[in-house]
Structures are given as structure tokens and as C-alpha cells.
Amino acid sequence: MTDERGNFYYNTPPPLRYPSNPATAIFTSAQTYNAPGYVPPATVPTTVATRDNRMDYTSRSNSTNSVAIAPYNKSKEPTLDAGESIWYNKCVDFVQKIIRYYRCNDMSELSPLMILFINTIRDMCIDTNPISVNVVKRFESEETMIRHLIRLQKELGQSNAAESLSSDSNIFQPSFVLNSLPAYAQKFYNGGADMLGKDALAEAAKQLSLAVQYMVAEAVTCNIPIPLPFNQQLANNYMTLLLKHATLPPNIQSAVESRRFPHINMINDLINAVIDDLFAGGGDYYHYVLNEKNRARVMSLKENVAFLAPLSASANIFNYMAELATRAGKQPSMFQNATFLTSAANAVNSPAAHLTKSACQESLTELAFQNETLRRFIFQQINYNKDANAIIAAAAPNATRPNTKGRTA
């Protein structure tokens, strides 16, 4: 590898002696050399045109166009090799990172700028040289496709009695372990290798087992059924609708009003907390939420309000603006008074008013639920191991015991 790399750099053109490398250079006078033993050619034209024809070093040194090029100095070759090899190794490493990024979505060694650079190169390649795709229609009608799917279901259906007792959506069967689990292990636990390793499959099965066991323990503790991802999907849909300024459907509106879904409650509480921090003197924690533009706006607004009035009077911008409007002659509107009265009455008469907890109490409650979940998780593992050992112990003597089913004593 070292000899090949040395030959590679030896055949490269010599380094540039000028700020740029013009494709065409014209010299208006002949070159003279004072080196001893130099014999000028018989005829040297007064105007010599040289073109960068990408020849190797040997052919360039023997051509007549090499009059304007300094002779190659081999003493500089180690320095060039060292500098060029650094960039060569960096390019190879970067290409390997790109391959790992596209193969297994590994971005651990890539910076955001590098990812943006990779995506830019990909977009440029797609735009300049798009790939032509031929679409072949396999089915003439939907009925043909349905018949094909029915035939595949019969051919690739249940293979044994254990799977025949289970439903189609049940993953606790050998077909899921043999088909779907290797793909999951190849994607997340194989380290970017081409061939699936046995350790990767075992690690994927272990992690999935722990995840399912913990979800079961958490569901029993929190008294919530196991489809826990439904809550996250509902929160994602709610957040998407809010970002798009779309109309909320009735089911999401009822979910928001019921306050039974913690993720939706956190979204609403976050928005209200940001408003309190911005305009009601709640603090400066909004710096972690706002972008640079809005952060500068809010800071400028607070500085201007503090310049107009003392900090004690302008901390709550709502009250300060209401006071200024009242001094200017504005009468409070009937709807504003009704809103304050209604909100106060709801806060007092609400059946959940006595359930208001402080932040410390909420944290202690969450910690208690997590401890209970871990306790149930540990007991599940103990019971599972005990039952598995009992089944193995019971199956050992039954292997040699004759079948007496149907006989009477």
C-alpha cells in the first residue's frame, strides 16, 4: 500500500508556483538559463503556448512545453507525501462515515455541518443525473391483487399448531422471531456490518424483552392499558395541528378538555408557562424555548417597559398595560370583567381545585409511580425465571415417561 501510494504521488503534477493554474499561458519572450551544461534548442519560438493537458510528470518533462516549468525537485517529495497523505486519509475516513450513515443511519461521528454537506451532495447528484425508474404493473385490477394476497396468506400462513391458535397480529410466535427480529437487529444492533451477527440478534431480543416487561409493569402501575404509544401518537397529532394552525377535530378537543392525557397536558402547560414567563414576570426560563429573533424581541420589550416604569410596576406587563389604558380613559369591557369573574368562579368551584399540587408533590408522586413500576418489573423477572425453571424441571422426567393418556387406573 505504501509503494502504490508513493507511485501515485510521484505521477502527480508538481506543485503550483503561481496563485492560479491557467489552462493557457503565453510567454512573450524566450527563457534563458544560466545553469552549466545547458544547451538551448535549435529553434525556440518567441511565443510559446502551454496547455494543461493533464499528462504525467515524465511526459511533461520531455515535452517542449516544459520550458516554462521548473524542473522537478525530488527533495520535496517526502513533504508532499506527508501533506497529501493526511488529506487522502481524511477523505477516506469521510467516505467511510458517509457509507455508515447511509447503511445503518449512524450519525455518531458526523457533525450537523457534515450531514448538511452530505445531503447537499445527494441533492446535487439527484438533480443533475436523476435515475430513471421503470414501473411494471403486476396486477391488472384490484381483484387480481386481492386474490394474489389471499394465495400468499395461505402459502405463508401458520406453519404449526402453536401459531394456528394465535391471531394475525400476535407477535409471540416463531415466525416473528425468525423474520422481523433479524431486520430489527441488523438496523440497530449490528454495528453497520453487512452480515448479521449472532450477538446482535441476541442483544436485540434482550432489549425488546426488557422493554415489553417494563411496559407491562408500567401499565399495571399506572392503570393504563399497554397501547402506550397511542398517547404519544395523539400528542404528535395535536402538536402537528398546532404548528399548522389547523382546526382541531372534536376528538382531540375532548381529549384536551378532559386532561386525561399527560403528553397533551404538558404541551398546553408549556405554552401557558412561556406566556407567564414572558408577560407575567414568571422568570427568564423562556430563553431555552425561543429562537434568537424572538428572544431579542422579548428582551427589547422588557427593557423598554422597564425604562418607562419601575421594575415593580412593569414586571407584569398585562397589569401595566391595563393600568396605562385605564389612565388614558379606557373603560374595562363587559366581556373582560365577565371573563375574570367566570375564571375565578371556575377556579373556586372546580371539583379538581383541591387536587392542585405543588411541583415538589408532583415530583414525589412520579417518583413513587416509577418505584412501583420497577418493583413490579423485578417481580415479573423473578416469577418468569421461577416458572421457566419449573417447566424445565417438569419436562425432564416427562421426556422418558411413557404416554398414558386415555388409560384408566
From Swiss-Prot:
Chief localisation class: virion
UniProt keywords, alphabetically: Glycoprotein, Host nucleus, Late protein, Virion
Family from the record: Belongs to the baculoviridae gp41 family.
Protein name according to UniProt: Structural glycoprotein gp41
Role description: Major tegument protein that participates in the egress of nucleocapsids from the host nucleus. May be involved in host nucleus-cytoplasm transportation of nucleocapsids to form budded virion (BVs).
Subunit field text: Homooligomer. Homotrimer. Forms oligomers in infected cells, while selectively assembles as trimers into progeny virions.
Any one of the GO CC terms: virion component
One Pfam family cited in the UniProt record for this chain: Baculo_gp41
GO MF term set: structural molecule activity
Localization, UniProt: Virion; Host nucleus
Glycosylation sites: 128
Protein's gene: GP41
Region (Leucine zipper 2 (LZ2)): 367-380
Renumbered residue ranges of the record's region Leucine zipper 1 (LZ1): 201-214
Disulphide linkage map: none
InterPro entries: Baculovirus_Gp41
Post-translational modification: O-glycosylated; by N-acetylglucosamine at one or more locations.
